[in-house]
């Protein structure tokens, strides 16, 4: 069989940053392989793995084992694991899963063709840099796997924060920004292909530019992206509160294309726990930032994440999170039970909170947030929102998102329309009903 006739399927797990890596790998493979969506049709299967928390690790291993079945039941000849789990546990994966023919770490995304070639030849190919240094640019081939109307733009790679519970700096390397010119050229190309919304992502988006330019460049980057014709929404994800400057607030406020939405992961609401997590700043400072954001941008939607059951977390410290959630009333809040990640400082502590209590606290917080989110959503009933149409349903109904909804992690807007709507178009929708996560409405004629 000629290489050009071989079919490759890429299975992506984890976060949008992983998705971008899969898109770059797919772009490189397009010249030599047919890309297929169904693994059962593929001669080569690539699993781009995640290892952020224990459940993600388990999902990645399960997926590798599931895909390995196609070596017996399907036509798969070569099975390769890439991404964070492969970077962290490459040797162990090769030893424990004999069906694996290759391993590739996070720093070798652009070397996927060489990896496949070696994996097909030798059946034991390990490429996993100790300290990943790779960062893609706009010249690399990339096949977007997201719907045509939006795209993720990775402005930086790696992380220098070293939160005590997190393994990411070890599997993604030091923080490194792309050049502003590279990002702008990529967004211009996306706009020419019909992309309406760009989501700026990194492990720490607010840090963008500091390593490369000696200053935080996110405000100027946003202003330049806003000048690109065709881009209508700019969404900020993964923003650290201590680096969110007054300049950045002003740019958000004065740039209509910036979504009135902010993903601001806080992780906890008690200063002692924050310090033990190696999170910079205090909860009072975070509260001050939130107050300022809501004062300057009254219609902003705020998303955060919290960790329950961090080592040593007392009931009193957990209640600080509960009271903070009640006081701040986030529009979106995701809670995760602490995951004990080996090789992290937090995992070495002897005062681990029992798993049952971690989960109980997580469930309690999410139950509270469900009620808060429902109440927060009611303010949109009767208002007219700009909605990006993304899916057609039967009976003249469509699914879209407002600027308050990031794709895949937030809610949607269900839209009734007497006329046909086009996927990727913006329409004005009068909101008639709201639940905790989704909105319902009718197209404004």
From Swiss-Prot:
Cofactor: record remark: Binds 2 [4Fe-4S] clusters. One cluster is coordinated with 3 cysteines and an exchangeable S-adenosyl-L-methionine.
Task of the protein: Catalyzes the methylthiolation of an aspartic acid residue of ribosomal protein uS12.
Biological process annotations from GO: tRNA modification
Domain Radical SAM core intervals: 145-375
PANTHER family recorded: RIBOSOMAL PROTEIN S12 METHYLTHIOTRANSFERASE RIMO (PTHR43837), RIBOSOMAL PROTEIN US12 METHYLTHIOTRANSFERASE RIMO (PTHR43837:SF1)
Gene field: rimO
UniProtKB keywords: 4Fe-4S, Cytoplasm, Iron, Iron-sulfur, Metal-binding, S-adenosyl-L-methionine, Transferase
Gene3D superfamilies documented for this protein: Methylthiotransferase, N-terminal domain (3.40.50.12160), Nucleic acid-binding proteins (2.40.50.140), tm_1862 like domain (3.80.30.20)
UniProt source species: Desulfitobacterium hafniense (strain Y51)
A GO term from the CC aspect: cytosol
InterPro entries listed in its UniProt record: Elp3/MiaA/NifB-like_rSAM (IPR006638), Methylthiotransferase (IPR005839), Methylthiotransferase_CS (IPR020612), Methylthiotransferase_N (IPR013848), Methylthiotransferase_N_sf (IPR038135), NA-bd_OB-fold (IPR012340), Ribosomal_uS12_MeSTrfase_RimO (IPR005840), rSAM (IPR007197)
Protein name: Ribosomal protein uS12 methylthiotransferase RimO
Catalytic reactions of this protein: L-aspartate(89)-[ribosomal protein uS12]-hydrogen + (sulfur carrier)-SH + AH2 + 2 S-adenosyl-L-methionine = 3-methylsulfanyl-L-aspartate(89)-[ribosomal protein uS12]-hydrogen + (sulfur carrier)-H + 5'-deoxyadenosine + L-methionine + A + S-adenosyl-L-homocysteine + 2 H(+)
Origin organism lineage: Bacteria, Bacillati, Bacillota, Clostridia, Eubacteriales
Protein residues bound to [4Fe-4S] cluster 1: 15, 50, 84
UniProt-annotated location(s): Cytoplasm
